[in-house]
């Protein structure tokens, strides 16, 4: 499971021009679910996300976690994080979990994360417009297999 985490001042999701989710200070997380992922990958990612110190303290050093700054999270499904562009010019997405199973893990991830933080979500599988006002910018890629 891959989570692309961006520290944001604000983030939102629109579908067909209608805003369906919005957060203020926190993280925009683009989540890619891979074929071999399980609930153990969810547990590893959430443990790391909640404790990551990506917010500045009083002297500007990244030393505070999202709980300490009372931040929120916007989670958006992103199967293209499974893309491989090693061969040719069209990415190969065969590493992505099939949609039905991926939606189950995506929903489980969002539900488990919401036990720790306020969580908003995009709509799994939909074409979305995702707005992000980066803070920093600070962007981190977490791969559950490497945690």
Swiss-Prot record:
Pfam families: Tyr_Deacylase. One of its GO terms (biological process) is D-amino acid catabolic process. Keywords: Cytoplasm, Hydrolase, RNA-binding, tRNA-binding. InterPro entries: Daa-tRNA_deacyls_DTD (IPR003732), DTD-like_sf (IPR023509). One of its GO terms (cellular component) is cytoplasm. Its main location: cytoplasm. A motif (Gly-cisPro motif, important for rejection of L-amino acids) lies at residues 136-137. GO terms for molecular function: D-tyrosyl-tRNA(Tyr) deacylase activity; Gly-tRNA(Ala) deacylase activity; Ser(Gly)-tRNA(Ala) hydrolase activity; tRNA binding. It is found in: Cytoplasm. It comes from the Bacteria. Homodimer. This is D-aminoacyl-tRNA deacylase. The gene is dtd.
